[in-house]
Amino acid sequence: AEQIGTPTEVFERPASTFVASFIGSPPMNLIPVKIDAQGQISTADGIALAINTHKVVEILKQKQVILGLRPEHISLDGDQFEVRVEMVEILGSEQLIHCLLGDTSIVIRADLHETSHKPVKAGDVIRIGADEKFPLHWFDQETGRRIEQADITA
């Protein structure tokens, strides 16, 4: 078995990118990134992500990892990185915003009524960010296995 646990445990702490890629609707965004010695994060194609570096601890520095961001944990009011909107799906009171971060596809799930931003449409370039109320997920780029907080703080 790839992972054993309650649905909530599997959702909140997927053991691998494989599990993360199908748990949740839509599933977690998986973004290959590299982290330099100062804790600065950039995508494989060199786009800087201004995610607070206090969340990037020593064990992750100077490594290539995968950053996992849940679609509902991305804020349209954030200012950490820029994406190009490819398509917007309206699903009742929610919208799914399909974007490109460089060459990486990501999906944002946003409540239509709770956001203070103006509506977005295909072709728009917008600035977004990781909602700091929620944890970031880190995975080993080679094995796909989750990098646990216990491993990080050890």
Residues of each region from the PLM?
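Non-catalytic connector elements of ABC transporters
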Residues: P26-L30, Q38-A154
